[in-house]
Amino acid sequence: MDEESLQTALRTYDAQLQQVELALGAGLDPSELADLRQLQGDLKELIELTEASLVSVRKSKLLAALDGERPAQEDAEPLALQNAIAETAEVPVAPGAELETVPSRETGPGPTERGQEEDDGEDEEGGAALSGRKVNAPYYSAWGTLEYHNAMIVGTEEADDGSPGVRVLYLYPTHKSLKPCSFFLEGKCRFQENCRFSHGQVVSVDELRPFQDPDLSSLQAGSACLAKRQDGLWYPARITDVDSGYYTVKFDSLLLKETVVEGDSILPPLRTEPAGSSDSDGSDADDPSYARVVEPGAANPGTCSSAFAGWEVHTRGIGSRLLAKMGYEFGKGLGRHAEGRVEPVHAVVLPRGKSLDQCAEILQKRTRAGQAGVSKPPKCRSRGSGPGGRPPPRSVFDFLNEKLKGGAPGAPEVGAAPPGRSGKEVYHASRSTKRALSLRLLQTEEKIEQTQRAIRGIQEALARNAGRHSVTTAQLQEKLAGAQQQLGQLRAQEAGLQREQRKADTHKKMTEF
C-alpha cells in the first residue's frame, strides 16, 4: 500500500473509533458494552499498525531521496578524506628547520616547546575532525577472503608498515569479532586485546574507499541479502516477499527462522557477482581485492611428470573433482596467480623405531652411495644356496625333523624341499599352511550353510506346488537332487580339510620343542 492509501485508512479507523466511544458513553446493555470494548481495542491496535506502516513507507521514500543526492557528494569525498588524513599525518618540517638554524642562546627552549605543543594540538584537532566520518574499509576474514565493509573512523593511528592509517569500527558486522564493543566506546572495557568483540581495526589510508549507502532499490523477491537479527549481527539470507517496506527473509542457516524486517535491517550482499561489462574489467584489473585471471598462454604451466590425482586410485578421495569445480587447471600451480607448486608432495617412509637424527644419517648415506655409484650385491636369501657355498651347521633338531619326515640326510627326493631349511623355517611354513587350511575350511562351511538354505527353500516350494503343476514340480525335484549332491560333495571336502588340519596340528606338536 502507498502513503495515500494508508492515510485514508487511518482516517477511516479514527472515525470508527470515535463512533464506538460515543456508543460506549450512551449507556447501553452490559452485553453490548463488552462487544463495544472489544471492538474499541481492535480498532486501537489496527490504528497503531497502520501508523507504523505509514512511518516505514515515509522512511523508505526518504532513504531513496537521499540515495539520489549521494552520488554528487561521493566524487568529492575521497579527495577530501585523503587530504585531511595526509594533513594530520604530516609533521611540519620547515618551522623546525628554521628553529635549528637560530642559535640556542638567542631562542631558548620556549619556542621549541610551544611548536611541539602546537603540532600535538594540530594532530589532535585533525584526529577529532576525522572521527565519526564514514568510509568503506577492507576486512580480511579468518579464511583469507577480502571484503569491504562500511565503517566509521574513530581515530588516527600509524599502520604496521609505518604509513598513515586510521582506526575504524565496522557498521554492519557479520561476525562477532566485527561487532563493536560497547564498553570500548565508553572506555570501560577490561579485556583490551582479549575482548571477543571489536575494538576497531587499523587500516592504511590508501586502502580506504568512499562510503557507500545501501541501495535497497535492487532488492526484490528472490534476491540475496544480509538481514539483521536481535543480536546485532547481519546474517546471509534470501528475500521471499516484499510488502509496503517490509521484507520477509529466509536465512541461509537452518537454525534461524524466517522473519520480517524493515528497510533499515536489510542490506544488499557485500560481495556481488561481477557484471561482466567492459568498464568493470578495466577498473578491476589493478585492484588487489580481485584475483587476477591468468590467460592460458600467459602462465608458465611448468613440467608435471606425475599423474594428476594418481593417489586417488587407492583411496576414495574427491580432491581432484573439488579442485576442478573451483577452477583448477591441470599443470598450473595453485593460488590466484598460478604460482604455486606443481609437483605433489611425495611421502617419505622413515625406518621404524629410529630417531630423526638416525633417519637423517641413513638418508645422507643413501644419497652419497647413489652419487658415488656404489651398487651393493643382492643379499642371498639363505646361506649355502649358491654353488660352492658353505653348508649351514646342523643341530639335533634338524636331525629329528629329517627322521620324522622320513628323509635321509644328503639324499633328498625329487621335488622335496632343499635340506638347508632350519627348524624355524619349517615352523613358519607349517603355520602358513595351517592358516590356509583354516581359511578353506571356513569357506567350505559357509558354502554348506548356503546349500542347506537352498535345499530348505526348494522343499518349501515343492510342498506349495504339490498336486498343482507337474512341470514345476519336476523342475524343483531336479534342483533338489542337484543341491543334495552338491551338499554331499561339500561335506566330503569339509571332512578332508578337517583331517589335514588335525595332521598339521599333530605335526606341529611333534616338531616344536
Curated annotation (Swiss-Prot):
Does the entry annotate any disulfide bonds, and if so which pairs?
A: none
Q: Which residues form the G-patch domain?
A: 315-361
Q: Which InterPro entries match?
A: G_patch_dom, Znf_CCCH, Znf_CCCH_sf
Q: Where is this region: Disordered?
A: 90-131, 267-296, 367-394, 492-513
| Annotated zinc fingers (C3H1-type), start-end | 176-202
- Principal localization? nucleus
Keywords on this record?
Acetylation, DNA-binding, Metal-binding, Nucleus, Phosphoprotein, Repressor, Transcription, Transcription regulation, Zinc, Zinc-finger
Kindly provide the name given to this protein in its UniProt entry.
Zinc finger CCCH-type with G patch domain-containing protein
Q: Which gene encodes it?
A: ZGPAT
